[in-house]
Regions:
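Sec-dependent signal peptide recognition
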Residues: 2-8
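C-terminal motif of bacterial Sec signal peptides marking the signal peptidase cleavage site
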Residues: 15-16
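Active-site-adjacent loop/helix surface patches within enzyme catalytic domains
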Residues: 24-219
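Stable alpha-helical elements in mature extracytoplasmic
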Residues: 55-61, 65-68, 107-109, 201-208, ...
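Second-shell loop/turn segments in exported
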Residues: 99-100, 122-124, 163-166, 189-200, ...
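Acidic, His- and aromatic-enriched active-site or binding-groove loops in soluble protein domains
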Residues: 137-138, 239-266
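Acidic/histidine-rich, metal-coordinating catalytic segments
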Residues: 218-233
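Short acidic, glycine/serine/threonine-rich helix-capping segments at coil-helix boundaries
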Residues: 273-285, 291-338, 344
């Protein structure tokens, strides 16, 4: 397994130095030099040389920018978690006199979690040799290793047709993490029986997620499961994935406030809810709330197989005790509490 994969530990800094030329033997260690980039002139005519500022580092001729001078409130960030890719136009020299512009951010705006539904060897084989991939693979071994399969700056093929809130095709903007887990089996009644995750896998995943969401400023609303972004097609990471534990113990992802849920529960009696449950106006409202929260659903005022899968996906994550695809009173209260806590901007 270790021969096929580039294995990483839990490191907070990744350098993509693939563009280096093979080095020759040296008596001294490789020398790191630091140059300074210049601050752009303020709007108006250029009247002189901009003041310099630190941050641009050169290692073996490969450049890195290690500081953020962007507006953090706008999610702008100038830091490079890897080498800077620079054009090499024939006959011309690209300079960084005014590098970096403050108006930029990361491609990586989402993290999407999956289970592999395979054992470790098959998971590694499929994710590295077929037309599907992920950036990271969490193994099921009790060690300190996490497998990296794709450069974070590259697009992995893990989510397929996907959507969340205003964004679609989330492979373009996400980091994919696969977890070795069998997924589910089906009992005689057709009900899915999911397999729990090992505690050591969750610890690895939490450390990896902490690093990624901190580096790329990924908000809680953008840490998602495959079933969140493709609810009519996918079930992973399933109802036994510990979303609440990630939220409570590691401050990762979303969860509702219990007090808010209870408040919404008291707004309708069980008898009233039973009467409203089949009302088209009420159904349309529930579907609209699912859409407002982020799910790709078209409100129709009626339940069908497709939009019940959206409810099921929501329950996998936030109501795992009941993932029937039917909106009960508690599911409705949880949905309202989440829309209130995490409104779309």
């Amino acid at each position: 397994m270790s021969k096929m994969l580039y294995i990483i530990g839990l490191s907070t800094l990744l350098f993509s130095c693939a563009s280096q030329k093979p080095s020759t033997t040296r008596k001294a260690s490789a020398r790191t030099t630091t140059t300074t980039a210049k601050t752009p002139v303020k709007p108006g005519p250029v009247t002189g040389v901009p003041a310099s500022r630190p941050g641009l580092t050169v290692l073996h001729g490969v450049e890195f920018y290690t500081q953020n001078i962007g507006d953090i409130t706008k999610n702008d960030n100038t830091m490079s978690h890897g080498s800077i890719v620079v054009a090499k136009p024939a006959g011309y020299h690209v300079v960084k006199t005014y590098f970096p512009a403050v108006a930029q951010n990361f491609r990586q705006r989402y993290v999407i979690l999956h289970y592999t539904a395979l054992d470790e060897d098959k998971s590694a084989s499929v994710l590295t040799q077929q037309a599907v991939s992920s950036h990271y693979l969490i193994n099921n071994k009790r060690n300190d290793e996490i497998y990296q399969l794709v450069d974070e700056n590259k697009r992995a093929y893990h989510s397929g047709i996907s959507a969340w809130r205003k964004d679609k095709n989330l492979n373009d903007t996400s980091i994919g993490i696969e977890i070795v887990n069998p997924g589910f089996t089906t009992d005689a009644s057709g009900r899915k029986i999911f397999v729990p995750y090992d505690e050591h896998q969750i610890k690895k995943l939490a450390a990896l997620l902490k690093d990624i969401v901190n580096r790329y400023q990924i908000p809680p609303t953008n840490v998602l499961g495959h079933s969140d972004v493709a609810p009519t097609r996918k079930q992973d990471p399933g109802p036994l994935f510990p979303w609440k534990k990630l939220y409570d113990q590691y401050q990762i992802g979303m969860w509702y406030d219990e007090a808010a849920k209870q408040g919404f529960m008291t707004q309708m009696t069980p008898e009233t809810f039973m009467m409203e449950q089949s009302n088209s106006t009420f159904i349309f409202k529930v579907q609209t709330f699912l859409q407002q929260f982020g799910y790709d659903i078209n409100p129709t005022g009626a339940w069908d197989k497709e939009n019940m899968k959206v409810v099921e996906a929501f329950q996998y994550r936030f109501r795992p005790e009941n993932y029937s695809g039917v909106v009960d009173m508690e599911t409705w209260a949880i949905l309202q509490a989440l829309v209130q806590k995490y409104p779309q901007k």
